[in-house]
């Protein structure tokens, strides 16, 4: 039986793809859970329209992310923390701290988009990538200074 997938299914296919499956698998699993629809001509047109709308939406979001990346590249964020004699911080600077500092500069960036491998624990200047979209990355500079 041929069905059109409405979402990505591991080991079967991706959203919008036409696949052949066993009739029982389609009737008992895919169709009741609305993971697929029967491959009729009307459903093919509907799925194609949904795919086009999804593609337009993705293109718009990516364009906005690219514009934001151009603006954000080169942005410098200064964070003051208490530190000891050997430039070791008492605590650390996390992606949440960086996101809060960016919000103070009117950049509303989710902390999960800040690609910080591990919290910053020393004073200094760091280049931090910010993943704004799947393949759109802006690089910001974070300066961690000693709090007076």
From Swiss-Prot:
Name under which the protein is recorded: Large ribosomal subunit protein bL9
Pfam families noted in UniProt: Ribosomal_L9_C, Ribosomal_L9_N
This protein's record includes keyword Ribosomal protein: yes
The family this protein is said to belong to: Belongs to the bacterial ribosomal protein bL9 family.
PROSITE patterns, sorted: RIBOSOMAL_L9 (PS00651)
Organism: Solibacter usitatus (strain Ellin6076)
One CC-aspect GO term: ribosome
Higher taxonomy: Bacteria, Pseudomonadati, Acidobacteriota, Terriglobia, Bryobacterales
Signal sequence region: none
Gene Ontology biological process terms from the UniProt entry: translation
Domain of life: Bacteria
């Amino acid at each position: 039986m041929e069905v059109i997938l409405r979402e990505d299914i591991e080991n079967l296919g991706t959203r919008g793809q036409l696949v052949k499956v066993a009739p029982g698998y389609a009737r008992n699993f895919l169709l009741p859970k609305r993971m697929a629809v029967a491959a009729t001509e009307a459903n093919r047109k509907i799925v194609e329209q949904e795919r086009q709308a999804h593609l337009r939406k993705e293109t718009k979001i990516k364009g906005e992310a690219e514009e934001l990346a151009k603006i954000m590249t080169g942005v410098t964020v200064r964070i003051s923390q208490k530190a000891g004699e050997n430039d070791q911080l008492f605590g650390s600077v996390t992606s949440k701290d960086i996101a809060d500092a960016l919000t103070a500069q009117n950049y509303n960036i989710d902390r999960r988009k800040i690609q910080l491998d591990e919290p910053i624990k020393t004073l200094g200047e760091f280049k931090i990538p910010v993943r704004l979209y799947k393949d759109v990355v802006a690089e910001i500079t974070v300066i961690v200074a000693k709090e007076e």
